[in-house]
Amino acid sequence: MKLEDAVFITDCEGPISKNDNAFELASRFIPNGERFFTLVSRYDDIQADIIKRPGYKPGDTLKLILPFLRAYGATNEKMRSYSSQNILLVPGAKETLKFVQKIMPSFIVSTSYEHYIESLCDLIGFPKENVYCTRVDMDKYDLSEYEIKRLKEIRKEISGMPMPEIPKDAATFEALPDETQRVVKRLDEIFWNEILQMDAGKMLREVNPVGGFEKANAVKEIVKRTGSDLSNVIYFGDSITDVDPFRLIREGGGLTVSFNGNQYAVREAEIAVMSHSTIIISILADIFRKIGKEGTLHLAEDWSTSSLKGICDPSLLMKLQTLLRDKTPRVERINPGNISRLIRESSNFRKTVRGEAIGRLG
């Protein structure tokens, strides 16, 4: 790989920010919104990872909750205002994005709504034309009084449902607990029969969240735009929405990094990072550009600050050395022998960085 061919792509929520904006919007606008969102998110995980519903992709939670956000008064302006006032960056994120933009074409590919992503771009000075995210115009959808009333009744029913359980070894719908199967069947009726027939159903038909295969499509478009190749891409992700781009890039010879990832991310990535700071993103991007995928993987097998000397930008190493000992990033190459441990450790670490409620989400 030539230095000038490297391309940097990252998810937003996780590697760059601590937010789960959709979860937070649900909590802000919808009564008992935290539980409501968590339940719909579990349903999303089951649809995407176990049932593999045709046309369904990880992150479609973001369209499923839209009718309810609208019924409870969410507008473009309210979503933009709330999002801009509640951005929580991972320490170092602004500096990392400035650094990577200097050394290679850099992009954000996020499932998040445009209201949040555009607010974040304004805050950190990232070019909006280098962002792929979920486009939605809330003000376009007018709901009748009857639909608003009915959606509020449905919200109450969903919030009162038992939380779906997903056993670790569940690979089929039949392997799910009976109670979870009943919840999933009822949610199928609600979303794909009742709501789809409402005016609010237009949101489910028209909004296309950038998760799963849509993130992979964004990666393909970025490679085309930059005239590069998948083997020149380094991608940072943290959740189920990154599984498809991870697979695409890995199979194309690029490098995939789980940053404080959950089980879905660690399962598909080649390097696992656990860090309170984005400095490690800057370092991995820098060394990937200089010594390529195999060289970076080799360093990750026996990671140490001393092994980075002579390769990594000295200013990055100085910043790394100023971190407190207990804040030093952990970097490991994922292999069959350590993957179970890394899934456990990364999932737990994720909760300490992003909070228990957000950390548990798929």
Report residues per predicted region.
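C-terminal cap/substrate-recognition subdomain and adjoining C-terminal extension
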Residues: 1-3, 91, 112-362
